Amino acid sequence: MAAVAAGGLVGKGRDISLAALQRHDPYINRIVDVASQVALYTFGHRANEWEKTDVEGTLFVYTRSASPKHGFTIMNRLSMENRTEPITKDLDFQLQDPFLLYRNARLSIYGIWFYDKEECQRIAELMKNLTQYEQLKAHQGTGAGISPVILNSGEGKEVDILRMLIKAKDEYTKCKTCSEPKKITSSSAIYDNPNLIKPIPVKPSENQQQRIPQPNQTLDPEPQHLSLTALFGKQDKATCQETVEPPQTLHQQQQQQQQQQEKLPIRQGVVRSLSYEEPRRHSPPIEKQLCPAIQKLMVRSADLHPLSELPENRPCENGSTHSAGEFFTGPVQPGSPHNIGTSRGVQNASRTQNLFEKLQSTPGAANKCDPSTPAPASSAALNRSRAPTSVTPVAPGKGLAQPPQAYFNGSLPPQTVGHQAHGREQSTLPRQTLPISGSQTGSSGVISPQELLKKLQIVQQEQQLHASNRPALAAKFPVLAQSSGTGKPLESWINKTPNTEQQTPLFQVISPQRIPATAAPSLLMSPMVFAQPTSVPPKERESGLLPVGGQEPPAAATSLLLPIQSPEPSVITSSPLTKLQLQEALLYLIQNDDNFLNIIYEAYLFSMTQAAMKKTM
């Protein structure tokens, strides 16, 4: 009875195992023999040693209803990957107790380790018999084992699929343990793999070499590098440290750079992307940020000399402006202390007020205030210091020309060392400057504000003809903000001027040559329109509370909106903008231009600063 019960349990176990095997291969119909515990080893040809795989479990030898008629499978206990091998005439078995070695048709050598030596010998004998049987059938050329593949097309397809799957699995496991580098054929493996180190070619390909001109064919110093800032015309502060060519070669340089960028905007970017190094970027021309009408004005007028450098593009030697056409080292008098604690709002306010005084300094502007205040004296010094060909300063007026003389003839004071560090981010003004005062319009090469206003009105009319697709106010207003200085350069100027006598001549001596290159038409609204107009009494000017020159913000705001009073009447009149055009232009500039928004914010800070000053009074 015990033997019958044991046989029943074994039979039930075989049935369960057969059902499990049929889930993987439905053509298995009978289990021939079983080995309870085996482990699979593979032989490494390079290391010439055996390596254990992750296949370990029960070995089943079975028969199939399709070809091949026999096979064995190791049901893996460690993972879901089982080892299946069909028994064909190509298998070669060798017994080395407790290992059963075999070599398959792909010449891969495996070793099966048996926990029970008796099972090892029994399974080895069974394998040899089945292999000899397959070899005998193949030698005879006829037999029932080959007929399903040849005669029955449906079973033949299933057998072929099974063989393909087994072969693919064997190749996968073989390649998985192999350490040889394999060729990458999938594009996703190349582009989506973060650990893949891509080689950097020393040269571009032949097609790129043919398409891209050599550096000696163009006058650009580095034509093979095209940065995004140069492509989209954005000013980069890193260009302040580059050396700029003289202004007389501006038109040739601009035409060559524009022709080169029209021909090769994308291919240069391809070559640029092959390098990990950041190339030295040269300053882009300012025409990239200007509207076409301003460019025409710069090209046509013989008296106006457009600058190849703005304050953002030329390296500032000592962070100061120029007087009488010469470079002097700083706006501070020798020995003047640094006022480090100047507030940020005062600096922003002075930067905004500095913008409006460029078009405001008319002959009558110097006589608005009391002569005893520093502002008119500084205006007088302004008119004397803006002669374009003068090398030595004119006779000092009320003692305000003495600091420039000290810097022409003296040395740099120790306080300007930190000033020079800030100055690298901002450029110095050009040697030749145009006067603002109307008394010097008769000199050669000098344009009065009236003539400049006429030219700007001509530009406005030309711009209105081409303004069908965009608002009339989109005349590159942010460039005007950039030319007035951004960020840090004015901070050092304010920090180093403790009193009004030193601040006033500094913020009024500004080169008017920035105006033809960057100014919008005369009807362009300034940011000061949005600020609350406040009148400042002369007492506040004398007490030194104003951060900039002593002229009221309302006068500065209206000077940009109204034509400058001139002795000769203005012939050309311009029509004002409609309310819709003004609304569209302001919305466009606020949404798309950060510099325009910064100017409005600076004007707001300026008004808040003045309100705070009045409260302190």
UniProtKB/Swiss-Prot annotation:
Location of N-acetylalanine modifications: A2
UniProt keyword annotations, A-Z: Acetylation, Cytoplasm, Hydrolase, Nonsense-mediated mRNA decay, Nucleus, Phosphoprotein
Bias kind Polar residues: ranges: 205-219
Region of interest (Disordered), residue spans: 195-222, 243-266, 362-426
Phosphoserine modified-residue sites: S147, S275, S336, S448, S511
GO molecular function: 5'-(N(7)-methylguanosine 5'-triphospho)-[mRNA] hydrolase activity; enzyme activator activity; mRNA binding
InterPro entries in alphabetical order: Dcp1 (IPR010334), mRNA_decap_C (IPR031953), PH-like_dom_sf (IPR011993)
Principal cellular location given in the protein's record: cytoplasm
UniProt-listed GO biological process terms: deadenylation-dependent decapping of nuclear-transcribed mRNA; deadenylation-independent decapping of nuclear-transcribed mRNA; nuclear-transcribed mRNA catabolic process, nonsense-mediated decay
Modified residues (Phosphotyrosine): Y191
Reactions this protein catalyses: a 5'-end (N(7)-methyl 5'-triphosphoguanosine)-ribonucleoside in mRNA + H2O = N(7)-methyl-GDP + a 5'-end phospho-ribonucleoside in mRNA + 2 H(+)
Comp. bias regions, Low complexity: 252-261, 371-381
GO annotations of cellular component type: cytosol; intracellular membrane-bounded organelle; membrane; nucleus; P-body
EC number: 3.6.1.62
Record's subcellular location: Cytoplasm; Nucleus
Chain positions with Phosphothreonine modification: T392
Enzyme class: hydrolase
Description of how the protein assembles with itself and partners: Interacts with DCP1A. (Microbial infection) Interacts with rotavirus A non-structural protein 2; this interaction probably plays a role in the sequestration of DCP1B in viral factories. Interacts with rotavirus A non-structural protein 5; this interaction probably plays a role in its sequestration in viral factories.
Free-text function comment from the UniProt entry: May play a role in the degradation of mRNAs, both in normal mRNA turnover and in nonsense-mediated mRNA decay. May remove the 7-methyl guanine cap structure from mRNA molecules, yielding a 5'-phosphorylated mRNA fragment and 7m-GDP.
UniProt family annotation: Belongs to the DCP1 family.
Protein name: mRNA-decapping enzyme 1B
Source organism of this protein record: Homo sapiens
